[in-house]
Amino acid sequence: YTLSLHDALPISPAAASPKPFDLTSTAFLIVAFLTGIAGALQTPTLSLFLTNEVHARPAMVGFFFTGSAIIGIFVSQFLAGRSDRKGDRKSLIVFCCLLGVFACLLFAWNRNYFILLFVGVFLSSFGSTANPQMFALAREHADRTGREAVMFSSILRAQVSLAWVIGPPLAYALAMGFGFTVMYLSAAVAFVVCGAMVWFFLPSMRKEPKVATGTLEAPRRNRRDALLLFIICTLMWGTNSLYIINMPLFIIDELHLPEKLAGIMMGTAAGLEIPTMLIAGYYAKRFGKRFLMRVAAVAGLLFYVGMLTVHTPALLLALQLLNAIYIGILAGIGMLYFQDLMPGQAGSATTLYTNTTRVGWIIAGSLAGIVAEIWNYHTVFWIALVMCVLTLSCLTRIKDV
């Protein structure tokens, strides 16, 4: 990705001639990849881990995702408000990586549902906040060095997707081949390397301490549209979370297909998301962000219709193209849409966007657990389909920026 980075980013003539290799941008790319890998080694197998290792019922599995999302929101709100007001994001990211390591160690050796939920998830929440903080730091770095923020951000997102191409199949291979302990220890290693990279290579962006206001600032302009966008992104991420919680168990328990297929499906979708994100970032100016979000929602609708109707490995893998368009555009454009609706509030906009994923997890956790407990895993995809329809109706009302 270093090549494409330099094609996309304008470099001042002075900086261009003596050093063609830009260490800071490369470090950002590697850190984005590592924070992605740390997450991608844990999330895809979590519902399976809770079912098989912790022996939790479907409702308890769903509740675990909900609980972890709620704890995550409190942690990230606290950190976001703090980092936008006072200083250095860099030391904060290192701290988050350190707690991420402790979380992985706990999951590696503990099998008590409640300890994992309250202690493990609290630590993981700090770990997962390393990612949005890294994006906020990247945005500040881009603004300060006069870079094209949209493209730089899209390329960083693509790194996270790349991590999700490798992560899920690797997670299933490690968990099925060597056990969950080895899988969680691998994630811990990713956090260690990531923390070290941040500490040694990322820039410190000192801020002048501002007068403290609320933790997360409300949008100063476009309030109605920011709220609508929050609902849209929450619904879209919610369907995706339903899919991540539900799909592995659906594939294994109801379709009786091999376990590794679940990992391959997630990896395939993530691989196809990379070109989708970059293309979306490229065309955002020409077509507008609202149009692209509508394209995404239609793709999502078709994807869940497919999940309800096709049950062979080849077709399930083919469907991932629609899933990639759906999530690739959402991941690439959603955050930038928030930043455009909330000018001058990059940290709050980014966190608001990140919280749509968490609220999506809250809704998905409760729905997936209850629906699977009462009916079956197949029914969960009907819920996702309804959420896609709601998304499309909200997208008719939002303004373009």
Question: Language-model segments: what does each one mean?
Answer:
Residues 128-143, 329-342:
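Intracellular juxtamembrane helix-capping segments at the cytosolic ends
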Residues 344-374:
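A late C-terminal transmembrane helix in Major Facilitator Superfamily
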Residues 1-9:
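Short, small-residue-biased leader/transition segments that mark boundaries at the very start
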Residues 290-334:
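C-terminal transmembrane helical hairpin of 12-TM major facilitator-type secondary transporters
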Residues 91-105, 188, 291-306, 385:
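Structural signature of the two symmetry-related core transmembrane helices
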Residues 17-69, 240-254, 262:
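Helix-loop boundary and gating motifs at the non-cytosolic
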Residues 74-88, 175, 276-288, 372:
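Helix-to-loop junctions at the C-terminal end of transmembrane segments
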Residues 33, 114-131, 234, 315-329:
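Hydrophobic core of transmembrane alpha-helices in multi-pass small-molecule transporters
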